[in-house]
Amino acid sequence: MSLPPIRLPSPYGSDRLVQLAARLRPALCDTLITVGGQEFPAHSLVLAGVSQQLGRRGQWALGEGISPSTFAQLLNFVYGESVELQPRELRPLQEAARALGVQSLEEACWRARGDRAKKPDPGLKKHQEEPEKPSRNAERELGDPGEKQKPEQVSRTGGREQEMLHKHSPPRGSPEMAGATQEAQQEQTRSKEKHLQAPVGQRGADGKHGVLMWLRENPGGSEESLHKLPGPLPPAGSLQTSVTPRPSWAEAPWLVGGQPALWSILLMPPRYGIPFYHSTPTTGAWQEVWREHRIPLSLNAPKGLWSQNQLASSSPTPGSLPQGPAQLSPGEMEESDQGHTGALATCAGHEDKAGCPPRPHPPPAPPARSRPYACSVCGKRFSLKHQMETHYRVHTGEKPFSCSLCPQRSRDFSAMTKHLRTHGAAPYRXXLCGAGCPSLASMQAHMRGHSPSQLPPGWTIRSTFLYSSSRPSRPSTSPCCPSSSTT
């Protein structure tokens, strides 16, 4: 009997950014993840919102252990889609979510398993409650108690390598202390030679030592490589704050190249830095990897700095980390801000002097059209005399234009022309052939085509008019007198 499928609803379906990215995918994807020979395009901004490990740009691959189908289900969950899977697929998906830092998917898998089993795995619960114990290989490397006083761990904090001594530290003048100091200086010298190493491996769930994946920048070029180095892993606190074990196949992804990111469609400048996640604090190793690629920006940043930022973000070198400008100290930032503000103030106050180009002045507005003719009744003004006379007929009620086809009368010629179109006729019609013409000049040209012998006696051009005008002669004292003053 087959069990019913399990449905995991995604909490990111209501996020507008995730919805937009899901509709655009695979367009504008700046991340290409290879899993088991299959490539999955994605947006680094969406991945960074759910996991600190996945929020990287470029092309990288996951190690063995995660199947392409499991990773496809994880991506669908991240992009706001509900995932339906069989009960046998729940545990691999939960392990993949735990290894890649997708806490929301891991919790959803826990709830789904709790609904079915009503209790969590006792072995995993015991492992979460008890702190991680060192393996036998690590105890062998520690050696006898006399060797425990030697430097045991080297951790990165804020981009510097600091030696942490176990229990008791030797005196300053002792040979052991001198050797430790010399070794620390050698480590710093090697780090200055662009050997940037950050362990991103994980300890296996069975307590055995896993394989460390190291990030290294080659001095001869910008290409990076992954080196597998066997040996004991660094303490869990230096890389991950959670004590939950992760399988050895959870190899961290690796950034190889950059592509145009999703920030461009949101009109936001690209940000290089640590991917954010609300439940996973930033660690020293991540600070070391990403510290050199943060771009200091201020509200009054100089134009050159913005140009450099845009150039660095828009044209990255394939196979290399995105290079930003050199970091500025607080004093340099303040000096550049003051210099830029002062230059703007100088240009604003002295536009006509040398060194500051004058601002282009807007073209002057055209002068207002004069209206010398005013109505003596309502005071309305007009630019042309015939406009004023036509308006005056509103007060007198005069309609001098009458239609020859019906009793319709109009106040002006344009209104009569519109009325004649309702009869399907033009203002002028030949009495011989019935052809209509839109203007008096065209009617005169049309009548020249007829023989004069065909015209009836006493014919005039006015006989072609389809309207009649009974405008009386204007008195000498016009009610609408021109005015010399303009408003």
Swiss-Prot record:
SUPFAM superfamilies: beta-beta-alpha zinc fingers, POZ domain. One of its GO terms (cellular component) is nucleus. InterPro entries: BTB/POZ_dom, SKP1/BTB/POZ_sf, Znf_C2H2_sf, Znf_C2H2_type. Pfam families: BTB, zf-C2H2. One of its GO terms (biological process) is regulation of transcription by RNA polymerase II. The C-terminal zinc finger domain functions as a transcriptional transactivator. Homodimer (via PTB domain). Interacts with the N-terminal of FANCC. Interacts with ZBTB16. Interacts with GATA3. This is Zinc finger and BTB domain-containing protein 32. The lineage of its organism: Eukaryota, Metazoa, Chordata, Craniata, Vertebrata. The gene is ZBTB32.
